[in-house]
Amino acid sequence: MEKQRLKAQLSSLRVPLFSVPWPEQCSNKAEVVEARMMKWADEHNLLVTDEYRNRVIRTRYGLLAARCYPNAGDELLQVIADYLVWFFLIDDLFVDCVEVATDETIRNLTAMVDVLDLNVSGSPPVFGELAWLDVCQRLRRLLQVEAFERFAQGMRLWATTAALQILNHLRPTSVSIREYQTIRRHTSGMNPCTSLADAANKGSVQACEFYNADVQTLVRQTNNIVCWANDIQSLRIEIHQPGQFRNMVTIYAQQGQSLQDAVETAATRVNKEIASFCELANAFTARDISHELHGFIDGLKYWIRGYLDWVVHDTLRYADQFIESDADDRRFSAPDLSLLNNSCSSVTESTRSLV
């Protein structure tokens, strides 16, 4: 009933554009990174059918990496692109585009946490686990220990707050905006992404800099801007998902607003958050701060602008013409693990060479 009421308002929906006062950036390695990312996804059996492969091709995750990390070294940029294609596919297949909860949900998510905690895969591995181990081992080699742990903690919170998101969708009505924002802040996967912003620019910041209160406010604002804008931009496809479909816009609609008014309310919040980010970033960078911290704050800006440009110029992830085919992944939700097992030994050998 809730979904049907929302779907009835989609045909006339107007989605706003967002802008920020700093220029577009993109690595000149974007196309190479995209091609290598597709090859890597193939080698790790992430592209479960030709239909799914075509979806990934038109989504352009390598371009997202190139826009959000324009100054990253070649090796780091590639592992980030590989991480992004892995994350979007796993998030869709484990959480968003399948039933709210399945028999495999707990096993799948705990396997991802175990890779972070134990630095090994299970036997047998779940879908995507060997690819995830490969990403983590490459990042461990490229990042300082504490910097990797920031990334890892963000991913642990993604896996664990997914359970809160599932609980919210098992309720007859959604939790409030405040509770939703807490869940969204971590299920988005933005914290692992922003944790790489320093290494991808001018080098790792010290822990005392990263955890500075103003810096953490900038990180949260970056997270909010991307997540809340995405709640608007992905609204049409998310409403058609069989499992997770509630977001900031639908919660405002649940409170009595029309869907268009709910979009405008969310958009106003995005624009206010952009203004607050700009004010704090300008004030903070006017201080005597380290070269690396300047690079980190630049990296947050790259993520905001890079994501917004990716949605407008590159990706078809949220395109209307693919809603019917892309919103429901239940037919892909239990990929044949024999695909993984057939290549398990070769992938494991290539992974070991990275340690």
From Swiss-Prot:
Superkingdom field: Eukaryota
Cofactor: Mg(2+)
Residues the record lists as binding Mg(2+) 3: N230, S234, E238
UniProt: substrate binding residues: R184
Presence of the UniProt keyword Magnesium in the record: yes
Motif (DDXXXD motif): 91-96
Site (Plays a critical role for substrate recognition): D92
Residues binding Mg(2+) 2: D96
InterPro entries: Isoprenoid_synthase_dom_sf, Terpene_cyclase-like_2
Gene3D superfamilies (UniProt xref): Farnesyl Diphosphate Synthase
Cofactor mode of binding and number, as noted: Binds 3 Mg(2+) ions per subunit.
GO molecular function terms attached to this record: metal ion binding; terpene synthase activity
Annotated site, Plays a critical role in the stabilization of intermediate cation, chain positions: F88
Classification via Pfam families: Terpene_syn_C_2
EC code(s) of this entry: 4.2.3.-
Broad EC category: lyase
Family from the record: Belongs to the terpene synthase family.
Protein name per UniProt: Sesquiterpene synthase MAN_10655
Species of the source: Metarhizium anisopliae (strain ARSEF 549)
